[in-house]
Structure formats: C-alpha cells, structure tokens
Amino acid sequence: MTRGAWMCRQYDDGLKIWLAAPRENEKPFIDSERAQKWRLSLASLLFFTVLLSDHLWFCAEAKLTRARDKEHQQQQRQQQQQQQQQRQRQQQQQQRRQQEPSWPALLASMGESSPAAQAHRLLSASSSPTLPPSPGDGGGGGGKGNRGKDDRGKALFLGNSAKPVWRLETCYPQGASSGQCFTVENADAVCARNWSRGAAGGDGQEVRSKHPTPLWNLSDFYLSFCNSYTLWELFSGLSSPNTLNCSLDVVLKEGGEMTTCRQCVEAYQDYDHHAQEKYEEFESVLHKYLQSEEYSVKSCPEDCKIVYKAWLCSQYFEVTQFNCRKTIPCKQYCLEVQTRCPFILPDNDEVIYGGLSSFICTGLYETFLTNDEPECCDVRREEKSNNPSKGTVEKSGSCHRTSLTVSSATRLCNSRLKLCVLVLILLHTVLTASAAQNTAGLSFGGINTLEENSTNEE
C-alpha cells in the first residue's frame, strides 16, 4: 500500500517516469556499447592480420629472391674455380715441358736457339737499357718490348737455377715494362740473378761481354699478395725495411754479397705476409657479420675488398708506383674504404642504424698533401675496364645486385614483425583503458541517478 501511494504521489507530483526507469531499459544500451567495442577490436585485429600477412609474404618473396641470388653467385664461383683450375693445369703443363732436360737440344736441332741465347742476342743488339727509366718516363725501351714479345711464355727458369719462379699469366699493374711477370717466392733464386744496371752503368757493353747470361729486370718481379708492387719500386722507395740498407746501389752492386739482397727480399716478403693476414681477418669479419651482400646500391663486398687491399698494401709499402695508367695519393684509399665498405654492427645485426662508419679515417686533414706523398695506382679506374688487355690483371665482373626493396627486406623482416606485435599490444592497452573509462562513467552515472532519486523522495 505504501508503494501504491508512492507511485500515485509520484504521478500526482508530475515527475517524469524515466527518472525511476526499470533496469530492463538499460540492457539494450549496454549491449550496443559492447557490440561497438567488439566491432572496433575485430576491425583492428583484421587490419593488423592483413598487415602481418602482407609483411610475411614480402619476407618470403625476399628470401626466395636471395636464394636465387646465392645460387647464381655459387654458379659464378664454380665457373671461376674451373677457369682457375684450367689455368693451373696449363701452367703445370708448361712447367713440365720446360723441365725436360733435352728441350734446348731439341730447339737447336730444329734451327731455333735457346731462350737464354735469344735474350743474350737481343741484349747485345739493343742499345737501350733493360731497366725502366725514371718514374716520369712512360716505359722501357724498344729492346725490352721485343724481348717481351719473343720470350713470353718461355723463361720460367732464371738462368741456370734449378728452382723455378712462378710466372704470372698477366702483369699487374697496367702498362708493365716487358710483359714478363714473376712472383717473388724464393729470395735466393731471385738474388742469384744478374740484374740490369740500366743507364747507371757506363760500361754496359763490357758487362754484357763478361756475363753471357741474360740480365733480368727488377720491374718484372712482383710480390705474391700485394701484387701491384715490384722489386724496382720497393728498392727505390722503401730502402730501409727492418733497419736494413736496401738501396738500388747495394742490390745492383757487381760482385756484392748476396746476403744483403736476400735479407731485403725476405723483409719485403714478411711485410707482404702480414698484409695478407690482416686482409684475411677483415674478410672473415665481413663474412661473419654482414648479413646481406647487397648492402648498398653503389657498392658491394668485392669493391670493398679491392679498395681495402689497396689501402692495406699502401700502409705496409709507402712507395710510389711507377707503371700505372693513372695514379692517386695513397692516402685517398682510406676515404675509398670508408665510403665503399659497409657499416658492421656486431651488437645488433637486425636493425639498421644511421651514423658513423665502422672504418674511420683519421689524420687526413691534419697534414696537407704535398708532392712528396707517395702515389699509388688507381684501382677504381682499373676495375671498371670490362675488357682487360694483355699486361693487365683480370678483374672480376660487376657485382650482381637485386633491387633495393628486396635487399632491405631481408634485413628488416624481423624488425617489422616485432613492430607490428608492439602496435597490437598498444592497441589492446588503449581499448582496455577506454573500456574501463566507459564502465566507470556508467557507474558514476548510476550513482548520480540514485542520489537524485533520494533527494526527490525526500
């Protein structure tokens, strides 16, 4: 009865019914809010699912492209190895033919003279010296060119030495003196030769009459690893390795001791060996930490290795190179390495950072370059030549690169996936916070209505 009276009084007082609405009317409003939240969450999940699938497909395509590139590179390496094996076989066959004891007699019976006799005849008939002139001149004399044309492929044994010196197929650097190129392996076999004194000796004819064996040229002997440096350049520029006196006057001294020459050549070989060790360490670091070979649009690991080798050899042998088509200051190779080699980040190999390079040149701008600075052959110019002529080293072809998108995708797939997961977590947090705020607002609204009802009742 009390309830009926209250309801009547509520109706008589003219109060609106929605102030004391039943709970059944609140349920559709709450259901619509929940449905809207579910729609937002499902839409966001669908969007990020599509985004993740797109990135996964992108990464899979990049991996397939990279696998194809690796197969192509392996095929190229196999072809290069086969070519090297064929060249080694040809060299071994040439060595076997020249090691036969009866080949001079056979040549004499066929009406041809031995290579030593031909070289001696050319030297006696030529009026130009066999030693290359000063670095400012272009090359050797005419007799040198004739000797390179006649004896190319024959003089593997130096004089009467029983130990052969390995002969290079092509001469490095470009524009070599005579076309005859040898690597320095045995210091005794090299120092036992009769070296040409060139224009320094005024009694050239007397020397030729006293020594029937041919005079060898220092510019025809190269180091094994730093194969762009000749003995002529080393004896001319680096005259004191390991506190030794290795000047040209000492080496070319007639009747001098062979001990000094051998010690100098062995010192140069030690420097060359240390440079090769440092290069192998750098190559192992590249192989270990460099994920993708296509790290740049303008450069590749082969370009980096070429300029790094040139810079490394220029640090061990600070001499000027003579037989080059174009020379640059040797210190400039440091900048080439800095710009062509990649940024190596051992701490995190998945994320690409911008900033300083892993190879930084120091001390280049402190001292100005003068004319006394040594100059080296420009390998940047030589590596661009696609058709190497005789007397040059055969360079590898251009780097096989894929597109920038594919090359960058192989390194950014994992980081993008992590970024998408992080965005999903943040979205879930935002939705949860908004839902909590809405529920709090509804509860506060209910409390306000109850308070209003209580005041109305009073």
Curated annotation (Swiss-Prot):
Spell out where the chain is glycosylated.
Answer: N217
Record bears the keyword Repeat: no
Q: Where is the composition biased (Low complexity)?
A: 75-96
Gene Ontology cellular-component annotations: plasma membrane
Which UniProt keywords are listed?
Cell membrane, Disulfide bond, Glycoprotein, Membrane, Transmembrane, Transmembrane helix
Q: Does the keyword NADP apply?
A: no
Kindly list the residue ranges recorded as spanning the membrane.
Answer: 40-60, 417-437
- Family in the record: Belongs to the NALF family.
Q: Can you state the subunit structure given in the record?
A: Component of the NALCN channel complex. NALCN complex consists of NALCN and auxiliary subunits, UNC79, UNC80 and NACL1. These auxiliary subunits are essential for the NALCN channel function.
What is the protein named?
NALCN channel auxiliary factor 1
Species name = Homo sapiens
What does UniProt list as this organism's lineage? Answer: Eukaryota, Metazoa, Chordata, Craniata, Vertebrata
